[in-house]
Amino acid sequence: MKTTLMAVLATTTIIAGTAQADEIIFAHGSNPGNPRYVAAEKFAELFTACTGGEHTVNVAASATMGDDSEMLTSATAGVINITANSQGAMSQIVPEVGLLGLPFLFKDLPTAWAVLDGEVGDMIDARANNAGLKVLGFWDNGIRNVTHTEKGVPTPADLSGMQIRTP
């Protein structure tokens, strides 16, 4: 299961080129050393290089611009331009994104990527566009299924009779 799906989003105005030309704000909630932090820093470096320095990226890490929900709101309002966000927060805007967290949904990462790079990803992007956002890509923290303290749960059938708590 993908317990956390990170979607990189930008307001449609940045894609259209009407946002501030000098600096793009990329906000996320991760701390230094986290893969999302490292990826955001690399994105900033490459984006600045690809634009010949005409545009720079200010990475606002460690939730300095708010939690995931607040960052999505800020992106729709044009306060920030890009956010690497969570499945839970994104599902408040595109409810279908919540389905991506179901246990055993994907048999492996290649299957998950095929789905997200296909019609499902296009549908998520279209719904995000309705809220003033543009999905640039997806982030994963690996596929996770259900874990239990007493026994393994390698298949859905292993859940039979088991009591579990969910958020």
What are these regions (language model features)?
Residues M1-A7:
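Bacterial N-terminal signal peptides that target proteins for export
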Residues I25-K42, S62-D67:
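Extracytoplasmic "Venus flytrap"
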Residues I14-A21:
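Sec/Tat signal peptide C-region and signal peptidase I cleavage site
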Residues A7-L9, A19:
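Cleavable N-terminal signal peptides
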Residues A60-T73, G152, P167:
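Short helix-initiation/N-cap motifs at beta->coil->alpha
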Residues E23, E45-A63, K134, P156-Q163:
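A local structural motif
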Residues G52-H55, M71-N85, Q163-R165:
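Alpha-to-beta junction loops
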Residues E45, S86-P167:
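Contiguous mixed-secondary-structure segments that line small-molecule binding/active-site clefts
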